[in-house]
Amino acid sequence: MVANNGTADALVAALKRKGGIQMTVLPLYNVMLIPETNLYLQTQAFTAMTGKEPENQDRLIIAAEKSPKKREEITEDDLYPIGVSGIITEINSDNNYIVIRTKKRADITDITIFADHTINVTATKREDTPGEDIDPDDERARLDKLKQALVGYFSNSQWGSASRGYIAQFGSISEIAAAMSPWLFNSAEDRYKVLEEDSKAKRLDLMEKMIYENIEMSNIGTEAANAQEADYQKIYRESALKKQID
């Protein structure tokens, strides 16, 4: 639904009467949205997609875009029906990036796009599969194995020794998937399939499989792997920054 400015004012008033909470809607493309991880974003990218400057402790609904579109081009059909809630925990003015701590998955309905291209949605917490436990020892073993695979992947690069320290900082497979998300070969639809999976165990399986497949695809040709090296350097630099911030 598209609303004019008068409708927007009326909607805000209605939300206040109902005790609703205004949250900034942030549409993102080519980012795997994962609960309970840190998401790094350039400040100008946040402003471009929300029409506002970031504020510390801003509460967000992050919506996954089906295709890359500018804020002015987005319609309600361009957003997937599941996103994640989040909060801005850090604004780094020196390096022009922000840190968003993602929270819970959310069902997104009642999408309204105003004349100024800001977006309002109804967001409802989406529950995970109840009664599901993940063996922490198994999860740790799988994380360690994946880290070793990443170390091996970068071992022949010019910064192979330095990458060990960055890789060691990851505390979960989710963190690795979130950091590598922009450089994975997978489509927006593939990334969304991880988010829409209600089982935490199956989400872990999907993320793990996706990362291994991308390592294998990158290893097929040395030329292709080298072409991506600069991008992966950026990933691990941001990971190092994350640990300094935390």
Residue ranges and their predicted role:
Residues V2-D246:
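N-terminal low-complexity, acidic/polar interaction/targeting segments
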